[in-house]
């Protein structure tokens, strides 16, 4: 199975056609892959396996949003979602202890979320101050 995140909207200055969220592609050996399901998620900027057959989807928007999907046969269903104070969420990784670390580009923060048997909870946000070499992007 292959998961592909597609941005659902773009800024007006970027001439691109919006995607539909998350497309799931399945195939059997020797067969052509096909998209059988589309999960509606706003601007999924990063997808990451949860270690149990499901995955997390990160929404890159004006507020941080993490969505957890659980497998259901050949597709997935929505399990839980948690919002957090951050802008421009762009990457996540999952620790063996089921802590989810989320980097947020625009707000310059790192958000830590715990997954306690399917219950998502924001446990910490780290704030960074200063800037990088390209001042116009900070």
Predicted features by range, described:
Residues 22, 63-66, 108-111:
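Structural signal for beta-propeller blades
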Residues 3-16, 57-61, 102-106:
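Conserved beta-strand positions in repeat-built beta-propeller and related beta-rich domains
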Residues 34-95:
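Blade-loop segments of beta-propeller domains
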Residues 11-28:
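Blade/loop signatures of beta-propeller domains
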Residues 15, 31-38, 118-126:
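Extended intrinsically disordered, low-complexity coil regions enriched in Ser, Thr, Gly, Ala
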Residues 76-138:
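Asp-box/WD-like beta-propeller blade repeats and closely related beta-sheet repeat scaffolds
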Residues 27-30, 70-74, 115-118:
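Short loop/turn segments that connect beta-strands within beta-propeller blades
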């Amino acid at each position: 199975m292959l998961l592909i995140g597609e941005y659902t909207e773009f800024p007006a200055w970027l001439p691109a056609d919006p995607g539909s969220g998350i497309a799931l592609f399945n195939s059997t050996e020797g067969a052509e892959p096909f998209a059988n399901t589309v999960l509606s998620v706003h601007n999924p900027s990063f997808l990451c396996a949860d270690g149990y057959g499901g995955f997390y989807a990160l929404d890159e928007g004006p507020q941080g949003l993490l969505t957890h999907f659980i497998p259901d046969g050949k597709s997935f269903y929505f399990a839980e979602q948690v919002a957090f104070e951050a802008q421009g969420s762009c990457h996540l990784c999952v620790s063996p202890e089921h802590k989810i670390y989320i980097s947020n580009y625009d707000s310059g923060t790192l958000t830590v979320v715990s997954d306690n048997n399917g219950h998502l909870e924001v446990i910490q946000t780290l704030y960074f101050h200063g800037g990088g070499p390209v001042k116009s992007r900070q």
